[in-house]
Amino acid sequence: SVTALQEAAAVAGIVNGGVYHSPTIIKSAVDGHGEPSEIPKTTTRRVISQRASEEVRDMMENVVSTAKGRPIPDYRMGAKTGTAQRIDPECHCYHGYISSFIAVAPIEKPRILTYVVINQPTNGHTGTAVAQPAARQLMSVALPRYGVQPSTDKARKEPLEYQP
């Protein structure tokens, strides 16, 4: 299993031209004496090719662009849904769901990533039905708040077709 931060960092590496950047969740730190403490530097490494990254972004954009009511106006986005059955440790049987939705925008040069995970949802069980509304709301606030410019190219209208 992985943490939400590990999952988000992995997806960011895939859509970021195939280059993984280790996540940093703190800006500064001090030791017990109030002295500044060194924070480990972010490391980077290539995890997939640039071409593979572009193909994954195309597929992720297709998830959003073919769904009605999902895109945020003026921004091309990409997303991946997730739905998993939970295993009950007492009976070792399936009991309930974990639903998720991870979105990146703008898809042509990702700047913002949102990852929403709902444990034991009560209003459905698919990532699209349960987690997507919160991810969309977060993204619609974060994009303008952090000064991310709208997409200049329009998303393709036709669905993506696999070409081996």
Range-by-range predicted roles:
Residues S1-T43, R51, M60-Q149:
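Active-site beta-strand/loop architecture of penicillin-binding DD-peptidases
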Residues Q149-P164:
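Short, highly charged C-terminal tails/helix-capping segments
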